[in-house]
Amino acid sequence: MDIQTILEKTLPGLGYELVDFELTAQGTLRVFIDKEGGITVEDCATVSNHLSRVFMVEDIDYKNLEISSPGLDRPLKKAADFVRFAGQNAKIKTRLPIDGQKNFIGKIEGCENDTVTVSFDGKTVQIELGNIDKARLRPEFKF
């Protein structure tokens, strides 16, 4: 099995969502997890201990394993992410331009039929999930 398959099969059973992962050229495997209510240090330790054992059994080659929350500016990858974070601001970069524009910063209005609706500058744009290159939440800080 590959790393993604192992993570997708293992993490939900532990009560966590796989947000993203990366394997660096130096051999560091970073796994970003989330759950309702957020991630604690204990959650990271639990997942790290469990995955270390699973990766040993599956003979996955890595040097260091890092488990982390996705942070306030978490990536948005799946339709469920855009549904969950409707009403929040995001920065979205598309693969192909929409009306001559590839970068959008605005409020996520929702996601239906694999199409994300975003409002910005008094306009609304619909972006197909397949056209999204990168998307991240843009947290607002009010002082």
UniProtKB/Swiss-Prot annotation:
GO terms for cellular component: cytosol. Required for maturation of 30S ribosomal subunits. Gene3D superfamilies: Ribosome maturation factor RimP, C-terminal domain, RimP-like superfamily, N-terminal. HAMAP family: RimP. Belongs to the RimP family. The keyword Cytoplasm applies. InterPro entries: Ribosome_maturation_RimP, RimP_C, RimP_C_sf, RimP_N, RimP_N_sf. This is Ribosome maturation factor RimP. Keywords: Cytoplasm, Ribosome biogenesis. One of its GO terms (biological process) is translation. It is found in: Cytoplasm. It holds the Pfam family DUF150_C.
